[in-house]
Structure formats: structure tokens, C-alpha cells
């Protein structure tokens, strides 16, 4: 009898454990934030149409609501969805780098139809981190609405290290002293890239 009672208690404990594990899995799969983070991919092929501006407004609002040091909001954001202006930028970047493959330079936007240019205030030490947090909020909110994105560093260099592109940087109209820090392309995906492995070994608990 005692043996049967023990088995019964073990069965109840096991069932309870399995129920909790199942609930945990279900909670994770039903959590939109976690699902968005885990399914987001960098998109390098886009459909030609620009992201609707009302959708971009939501993405931008999510961006500027990112955490930032001392609430300095040490960023400025410019959005370009005019294909002619994006073409002007591509041409200027290629002309400004005559020793580089022009197709490679012109392709640095990855043909994203909507480009966001983020500048930082270098007078604040942590402004670069703030811009990164802003961009992360944007790409996650975009993905949750079916909009792909890609964070880009090469256009920053191509646009800022030569005189050919200066008129276009001036056209973006950043405040005096602000420096272009990051570019993010947005658009509707024309590919479904697989997830790339992440190295969990780089994460450790320290007791």
C-alpha cells in the first residue's frame, strides 16, 4: 500500500512538472515580443515598393521610445523613401570612391526602398549606444508588422569620407555637429533567410 502511495505521489509530481513545462513553452510561443526577436532576420532582398509612411511612423515612434542615457535623446533621424534621391546617393557614393567596384558601392543600401539615416551627438559619450538601441526598437517593431530591415555601416563611410557626397549629407539636414552613425534599410522582404547559429558559449553566469 505504501509503495502504491509513493508511486501515486510521483505520478502527480511528474504530471505537474510536465504541465508547468508545457505552460512555459506555450507562454514563450504566445509571447509576441519573444517570437519577434527570435524570428527576425536581416533582409538583403526587397520588393520594390517603399514602406507606407503610416507604417513607418509607427516604426519611428517605437524607435524614439527606446531607452537612452539620461533621456538626452542624443539622436536625429532622417527617412528617405524617394527613389530618385536614393539613386543620387548611390551615384555620388560611387563617384566618391573611384577605386572601388561601383556596383558594390551602389549596392550598399541592399536595394531597400526606404532608408533611415541615424546621426548622433558626439558631445555625449553614450550617444552611439543610444542610436543602437533606437535602431533595435525600429527593426523589431518593423518585423512584427511584416516589414524587413537591415542595419548598415558601409553607407556611413561611403557618404562621409569624400566631398562628392557632402551636398547629400547636407540635404539630410542634421543639426550642426551631429555625425551620421548608422543606416537602416526597410522594405517588404523578397526572401526568407534561415537563422544563423548563435554561440551560447559566449554567455556565462558568474556566481
Positions of PLM-derived features:
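Acidic, surface-exposed loops and disordered segments
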Residues: 14-207
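Sec-dependent signal peptide recognition
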Residues: 1-7
Amino acid at each position: 500500500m505504501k509503495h502504491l502511495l509513493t508511486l501515486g505521489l510521483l505520478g502527480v509530481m511528474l504530471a505537474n512538472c510536465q504541465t508547468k513545462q508545457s505552460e512555459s513553452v506555450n507562454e514563450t510561443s504566445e509571447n509576441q515580443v519573444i517570437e519577434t526577436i527570435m524570428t527576425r532576420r536581416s533582409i538583403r532582398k526587397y520588393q520594390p515598393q517603399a514602406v507606407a509612411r503610416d507604417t513607418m511612423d509607427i516604426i519611428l515612434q517605437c524607435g524614439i521610445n527606446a531607452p537612452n542615457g539620461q533621456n538626452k535623446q542624443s539622436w536625429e533621424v532622417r527617412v528617405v523613401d524617394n527613389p530618385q534621391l536614393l539613386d543620387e546617393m548611390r551615384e555620388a557614393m560611387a563617384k566618391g570612391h573611384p577605386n572601388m567596384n561601383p556596383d558594390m558601392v551602389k549596392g550598399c543600401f541592399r536595394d531597400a526602398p526606404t532608408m533611415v539615416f541615424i546621426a548622433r551627438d558626439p558631445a555625449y559619450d553614450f550617444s552611439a549606444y543610444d542610436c543602437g538601441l533606437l535602431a533595435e526598437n525600429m527593426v523589431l517593431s518593423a518585423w512584427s508588422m511584416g516589414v524587413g530591415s537591415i542595419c548598415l555601416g558601409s553607407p556611413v563611410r561611403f557618404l562621409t569620407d569624400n566631398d562628392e557626397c557632402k551636398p547629400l549629407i547636407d540635404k539630410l539636414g542634421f543639426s550642426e555637429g551631429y555625425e551620421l552613425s548608422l543606416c537602416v534599410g526597410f522594405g517588404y522582404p523578397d526572401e526568407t533567410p534561415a537563422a544563423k547559429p548563435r554561440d551560447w558559449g559566449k554567455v556565462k553566469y558568474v556566481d
